Regions:
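Metal-dependent nuclease catalytic cores that hydrolyze phosphodiester bonds in DNA/RNA
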Residues: 1-85, 110
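Mg2+/Mn2+-dependent nuclease catalytic core
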Residues: 61-155
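Conserved pre-motif I regulatory segment
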Residues: 174-216
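A substrate-engagement module of RecA-like helicase motors
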Residues: 186-187, 239-348, 356, 406, ...
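Walker A/P-loop
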Residues: 208-230
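Signature of the SF2 helicase/ATPase Hel1-core->accessory helical subdomain module
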Residues: 227, 254, 328-347, 351-456, ...
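A contiguous, basic/glycine-rich beta-loop/short-helix subdomain that forms a polymer-engagement track
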Residues: 323-348, 359-366, 459-574, 579, ...
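Conserved RecA-like P-loop NTPase helicase motor core
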Residues: 571-583, 635-746
C-alpha cells in the first residue's frame, strides 16, 4: 500500500517548528501597500543581479519515513554563483532601518537553509552559501548577511528539523486510524424522533455530493445531533476531514459540546475544541498581548509547541477549563494556544467570525490559497444574515480621523500628512451630505486610507514594540478593516455617507447582500449545512446566504402535538407607531392581565423595543397588578450574571411570574425553559426593525432588484424575531403552553403566509374573548391529564 504524502511549504515548516520569542501585538500587520512594495523590491533586486541570477526557482524534496513521505516545497527568491560558489538568496522587505540590523531573523535564515539543502540534492556541491538580503521598503537601502555550510552540516540540520515535524505527523496519522475505526459501528445515540431521520439522511447526502443544504426544523426535533452525527459518519467514510460547528451564541456552543460528548460515550474517538473569545480566556484584566504587560506573552513562542503537543496527545476534548489548565502549566497565552491546537483537531466549535470575518478568520484554514475537506455546520443560520452584513461592512468617521491626526503629531509627520489628506477628502463629502448620500464608490479615499495604513505600519515597525496610544491603535484596526472591505466592493455593496452624532461625516461601505462573501469562505471547504428553527421564507435566506443554484432544502414539521398548545392572534390590537399611546398600552396590558389570570404559571411578554416595553409595564403595574403576580423586566446591556439571575427566576417561581422582554434580545432565542418554567409567550407586534438609513437603503436596493424591498428590509427580519420569541414555549413532548400574537397585522395574508405549517390551527381572539378561549384550552389540558 502506498504511503501517504504530506506536503508542506518551506515557510510554513520553519515558522511552525522554529517559532520562538514573545507574543507582541504592538507591531503592524502586512497591508496591501507593504505587500506591493515588497513585490516591487523583490523584482528590482532580482533584476539588477544580472543574467547569472536565477529568480523565483521552484524547489521540492521528498523525505521517506516508515509511515509517511514528507514533501517540502517552495520557491527560492534567487540562486546565483559567485567565484565558483553557489548561493541561495532570501529577500525580505522591511520598514526598519536596515543599517541597524545586526543579524538575520532565525526563520529567514532557516528558509534559506532549507532551499540550500534541497538545491544541493540536485547539484551536490561541497559547500553552499545562504544570503539573507534585507531591503528597506521606502529607501530601498540593502543589507546582506552571508553564511556558508557544508552538505553534512546542512543535512544534519535539515534532518533534525524534519524529525521534529514528523513527530506531529506520525501522531496525526495514528490518531486518524483510531478515530476512523471508532466510527465503523457508530449508531445514532437515541431513538429517532419524527423528522430526525430525514435530517440525518439529507445532511449525509449533501456532504457526499459536496453541496449545501438549508434545514428548517422547529424546536424539539434535535437539530444539533441530527447534523453532527451524519457529519461525523461522513468524516469516518472519508467524505470530509474537519467539522466546523459555527454558532452565533454561547448557549448553542454548549449544546454542540454535549452532542459530541454523547457520541463519545457511545464509542466515538474525536478531538473537539471550542474556541472561546480572547477576553474570556485571558489571564490578565486587560488583553494586552505583549511581553511588557503580560507574563504569558513573554517567551510564549518558545513553549507553545510543547504545550500544544502534550494537550493534543493526552486529551480529546478542549473546553475553556482544559485550555486554561494547560496554558497555566506551560505559561503560555491560552487563546493563542487554542488557535494553534485547532489546526490539529477533528472538530472546531466556534463563533461565525472565525470562518467568515475577514479580520478574524482562522488563516491556517481559510487564508489565501488554502482550502481543505471541511464540513460546515451553521447553527441558528438566520443570524448569519445580519452578522454577515456586519462582518463585511466598514466605515471611516471624520471625527476619528481628526482625533488620530492629533495623536499622531507626537510620532510621525508622514502619518499626519496622510491623515490630513483623508480629512480633506471627507470634508468635501461632508459638504454634500444632508441626511445620507449614496455614492458610486469611495473614490480617492481608498488610496488615501492605503497611504495612512502604510505610514502606520512604518511607525509601528520603527517603534520596536514601544506602545502607541490605545486610541491610535484602535484607529489602525479601523483603517485595516476599511481596506479589507474596500477590496470586496461589488454590486452587493452600497457606498454612502451620513452625518455622525458629532456633526462629522461618516463614509460607509455597506454590504447589503453577504451571500457572495459567505460563498467565498464556504468554497474553501466541501459542504455546508445551514439550519435553524426559523429559516422562513427559505428563498429569502437562500438569496442572502448562498449564491449556488443547486442547494438542497428540507422542511421538517414539529414533532409536538398541536393539542398541547394554543396559538391565538389578537385582531383588535396594534403596535403601529401611529396607534401608540395610553389607549393601546392599556389594551395590551389588559390582554397580558387576562392571559396570566387564566392560569397560574410563568409567562414572557416580548416587545419591539425597550421604550414600548417600559410604557406598557408602567400601565400594567399601575392598573392591573395583583399580589400573586410578580413582574420582572429585561434591561439594556445585561451581563452574563444578570442574564442568569433573570432566567433563574423562572425556575424558582411558584406563583405567577411575568417576564417583560424585548424581541430579538438575549431572552428571545437560545434559551430552554422547559415544562412549567414557561407556559406562555405573548408577542406584541410584528417585530419590524426601526426605520433608519440602513433599512431604507436595503428596501431601495431590493426594490431595484425586482423583489419586494419592504419584505427584505422589514417584514422578513421582523417575522424571524416573532418566530424566535414564540419558540420559547413548548420545548419537549410533555410541555403545554399558549402563544398570543397581539397585532391585527398578523391576520393579513402577508403575515399568514410566513407562519410555519404547524400553526395551521391558529385562532383569532379579541380582548373580550381571550379569557374564555384560553380557559377552554387549559380546561382541556387538565381533563386530559
Amino acid at each position: 500500500m502506498d504511503k501517504p504524502v504530506v506536503r508542506i511549504s518551506v515557510r510554513n515548516l520553519v515558522e511552525f517548528i522554529l517559532r520562538s520569542g514573545d507574543l507582541d501585538n504592538r507591531g503592524g500587520s502586512s497591508d496591501r501597500e507593504a505587500m506591493q512594495k515588497g513585490s516591487r523590491l523583490h523584482r528590482k533586486i532580482q533584476g539588477r543581479m544580472g543574467s547569472h541570477y536565477r529568480a523565483e526557482v521552484s524547489l521540492k524534496y521528498k523525505t521517506e519515513y516508515e509511515d509517511v513521505s514528507i514533501q517540502v516545497e517552495g520557491r527560492a527568491d534567487g540562486i546565483f554563483t559567485e567565484d565558483g560558489q553557489c548561493w541561495i538568496d532570501e529577500i525580505k522587505g522591511v520598514y526598519a532601518d536596515v543599517s541597524q540590523l545586526e543579524k538575520p531573523v532565525e526563520v529567514h535564515r532557516a528558509q534559506a537553509m532549507c532551499y540550500a539543502w534541497i538545491y544541493a540534492q540536485e547539484q551536490k556541491p561541497e559547500k553552499i552559501g545562504v544570503q539573507m538580503t534585507y531591503g528597506n521598503l521606502d529607501t530601498e537601502e540593502l543589507k546582506f548577511f552571508r553564511e556558508e555550510y557544508t552538505l553534512e552540516e546542512l543535512g544534519l540540520w535539515y534532518q533534525n528539523l524534519l524529525d521534529r515535524y514528523h513527530k506531529w505527523i506520525a501522531y496525526q496519522f495514528a490518531w486518524k486510524k483510531e478515530r476512523n475505526a471508532s466510527m465503523s459501528d457508530l449508531e445514532f445515540p437515541f431513538e429517532y424522533r419524527e423528522g430526525q431521520r430525514k435530517i440525518v439522511s439529507g445532511v449525509y447526502h449533501t456532504i457526499s455530493t459536496e453541496r449545501q443544504i438549508f434545514v428548517q426544523a422547529p424546536t424539539g426535533v434535535g437539530k444539533t445531533m441530527s447534523t453532527i452525527f451524519p457529519a461525523v459518519r461522513a468524516v469516518g467514510a472519508g467524505l470530509g476531514e474537519n467539522i466546523f460547528y459555527l454558532t452565533a451564541k454561547t448557549i448553542t456552543r454548549t449544546v454542540a459540546e454535549e452532542a459530541f460528548s454523547i457520541l463519545k460515550e457511545h464509542g466515538l474517538k474525536f478531538k473537539v475544541i471550542t474556541i472561546t473569545a480572547k477576553e474570556k480566556l485571558c489571564f490578565c484584566d486587560k488583553t494586552e498581548c505583549n511581553p511588557e504587560n503580560c507574563l504569558w506573552a513573554r517567551g510564549h513562542l518558545d513553549r507553545v509547541n510543547d504545550a500544544v503537543f502534550e494537550l493534543w496527545t493526552t486529551q480529546d476534548s478542549y473546553d475553556r477549563d482544559t485550555l486554561l489548565e494547560y496554558a497555566k502549566k506551560w505559561q503560555v497565552c491560552p487563546f493563542e494556544m487554542c488557535l494553534n491546537l485547532a489546526v490539529w483537531v477533528d472538530a472546531v466549535i466556534c463563533d461565525y467570525n472565525y470562518v467568515f470575518d475577514p479580520n478574524v478568520y482562522l488563516k491556517r484554514f481559510f487564508g489565501e490559497g488554502t482550502s481543505g475537506e471541511y464540513i460546515f455546520l451553521i447553527d441558528e443560520a438566520h443570524n448569519l444574515v445580519d452578522r454577515g452584513r456586519e462582518m463585511y461592512s466598514a466605515h471611516v468617521d471624520r471625527a476619528d480621523v481628526l482625533e488620530a491626526k492629533k495623536l499622531a503629531a507626537d510620532y510621525s509627520k508622514g502619518l499626519v500628512r496622510a491623515l490630513e489628506k483623508v480629512n480633506r477628502q471627507l470634508r468635501t463629502l461632508e459638504k454634500e451630505c444632508t441626511e445620507y448620500e449614496i455614492l458610486p464608490n469611495p473614490g480617492a479615499i481608498s488610496l488615501g486610507m492605503l497611504q495612512v495604513m502604510g505610514e502606520m505600519d512604518k511607525l509601528l515597525e520603527e517603534l520596536h514594540g514601544k506602545e502607541l496610544p490605545e486610541q491610535l491603535l484602535e484607529f489602525y484596526f479601523c483603517v485595516r478593516d476599511f481596506l479589507n472591505i474596500d477590496e470586496l466592493l461589488d454590486e452587493n455593496y452600497v457606498v454612502y455617507t451620513e452625518m455622525g452624532e458629532g456633526g462629522k461625516v461618516i463614509l460607509r461601505l455597506f454590504c447589503v447582500n453577504p451571500a457572495a462573501n459567505i460563498h467565498r469562505c464556504l468554497e474553501k471547504g466541501k459542504s455546508a449545512v445551514f439550519f435553524s428553527a426559523t429559516l422562513l421564507p427559505m428563498d429569502y435566506y437562500r438569496a442572502l446566504l448562498s449564491t449556488r443554484k443547486d442547494d438542497y432544502g428540507i422542511y421538517v414539521t414539529s414533532p409536538f402535538r398541536q393539542e398541547n398548545r394554543c396559538i391565538l392572534t389578537g385582531r383588535d390590537v396594534s403596535s403601529r407607531y401611529t396607534r401608540r399611546g395610553y389607549e393601546e398600552y392599556h389594551r395590551i396590558a389588559s390582554y397580558i392581565a387576562r392571559t396570566v389570570w387564566t392560569r397560574k404559571g410563568n409567562y414572557m411578554v416580548f416587545f419591539p423595543s425597550y421604550k414600548f416595553m417600559e410604557d406598557v409595564l408602567e400601565v400594567y403595574e399601575n392598573e392591573f397588578s395583583a399580589e400573586w403576580v410578580r413582574c420582572i423586566s429585561q434591561t439594556s446591556g445585561m451581563n452574563e450574571r444578570e442574564k442568569e439571575e433573570f432566567l433563574e427566576e423562572f425556575s424558582a417561581s411558584e406563583g405567577t411570574l411575568v417576564g417583560f422582554c424585548v424581541m430579538g434580545g438575549i431572552f428571545s432565542e437560545g434559551i430552554d425553559l422547559m415544562g412549567e418554567k414557561l407556559i406562555g409567550a405573548i408577542i406584541i407586534g410584528t417585530g419590524l426593525p426601526q426605520i433608519g438609513t440602513e433599512r431604507e437603503i436595503l428596501r431601495q436596493y431590493y426594490d431595484k432588484k425586482g423583489v419586494n424591498g419592504f419584505d427584505y428590509a422589514y417584514r422578513y427580519p421582523g417575522m424571524n424575531k416573532v418566530l424566535q420569541s414564540a419558540g420559547r414555549v413548548i420545548r419537549t413532548q410533555e410541555d403545554t403552553g399558549i402563544i398570543l400574537l397581539l397585532d391585527e397585522r398578523f391576520t393579513g395574508k402577508d403575515y399568514r403566509n410566513l407562519f410555519p405549517a404547524e400553526w395551521s390551527d391558529r385562532g383569532n381572539c379579541t380582548l373580550n374573548t381571550v379569557e374564555e378561549q384560553l380557559g377552554s384550552f387549559w380546561n382541556r389540558i387538565r381533563e386530559k391529564n
